[in-house]
Amino acid sequence: MLITNLKIENFRNYNKLNLNLNNKINIFYGNNAQGKTNIIESIFLCSIGKSFRTSKDKELVKFDKDFFRIEVQYKKSDRDGKIKIEYSDKKHIFINGIKVKKFSELLGKINIVIFTPDDINILKNGPKMRRRFLDIMISQLRPNYIYCLNMYTKTLEQRNAYLKQIKLEHKSEDLLDLWNQKLYEYGEKIYKYRLEFIEKIKEKINDIHKKVTGGNEEIKIEYISDFSSEENFYMQLKQNQKIDIIRGATSKGIHKDDFIVYLNGKNVNTYGSQGQNRTVVLSLKMSELQVIKDEIGENPILLLDDFMSELDKERRKNFLENIGDTQVFVTCTDKIDIENLNSNIYNVIDGEVFLRKDWKSNGKIWTWIQSRANTSLRRSWSCKKKTWYVHWKCIYKRITSLSIRDCRQLCWWGFGRLLYTYRSYNRAREYNNCVR
């Protein structure tokens, strides 16, 4: 599947953005806090319906604006599709122009695999991140999964509330059986889904990890759950009922599930180095990509947020050369020059995106630099040195993305402008002397 076009309006630090995307590799580079991750976030939002950075949609709206809009055009199984998400007072989702009531209807339309800097800590942090990893993958492939997960969460909250009422208001414990039954009903389905996909990952991850490490390490995954059978689940709830009442929270259930990764027989979480953690997480993500591909019959979209900073130049190139026909979106702080690969390289500056091409052929770059330079020259005329510096600093950022030939052309143009300004300044000074 492919994303062919991305439109953004009033999202994060973007006013308006319209990008026709490459069907292979799209690289967005620039300094920190320029808006690179916001592009990844907008695609993720159109796939999952939620941001991976915040739970509050209001925070996604550009400062001083009251709405945002994202529109993605994509191709899947040789069919064109369009997803639009708008937010003003609340979030509205449109699929092919038709408004949908539940964000769960969005899941599976655009399949993605995302790798963010926080994912490095999947194995180091608590089980919550590992469950989230499974939830994002499964919800894209099994529409009923997100429903079961939401209902389980709702039932869990109700049971916890009743546990507190038993403690404070001395209510009957008999009603807990009702919540226990519902927890089992939804928990059983969630457990089966998770177990199914853990097994699928197990089949893929060892071969993938051997390719990443050169065949030097053996990797295994163990799924840990309180949910093995109906009798066992009820027994654990009964055994921990007194403790649950004291704490006002449910201590057993699929909300406590986890999985452990072993590297050469040792727990990576406990004994793995930082480098080993990185390679294991990379193997997990690539296994996720292969599982989704097997399920839907085509490659999902791969989103890599600041992932390339973890790899040296040679490994970056090798990785991008070996991802097959997957469409990739990469953000990084440095330019990545890839020869003989189908790619678009974009420079992101202050919420503006510039496609890196020959300078002369890209009128947008020329117009932008020219307007910045002319503004700075006018302001330097009025002796606003600070403003002059700020404008030329912006121009310098943009110049760093140009080729040597383009920089040479820009220098000649800039020299001419400065010479013109100097002569104008001298004429003005002579005129002022005459007036005096």
Predicted segments, located by residue:
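Low-complexity basic/metal-binding stretches
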Residues: 362, 366-368, 374-383, 388-436
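Nucleotide-state sensing region of NTPase/ATPase domains
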Residues: 47-121, 127-129, 138-141, 145, ...
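Conserved lysine of the Walker
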Residues: 36
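Walker B catalytic acidic pair
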Residues: 305-307
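Conserved NTPase motor "head" modules and their coupling/switch loops across ABC/AAA+ ATPases, GTPases
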Residues: 1-31, 170-301, 310, 318-322, ...
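An accessory alpha-helical subdomain
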Residues: 115, 121-213, 224
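Conserved H-loop
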Residues: 332-334
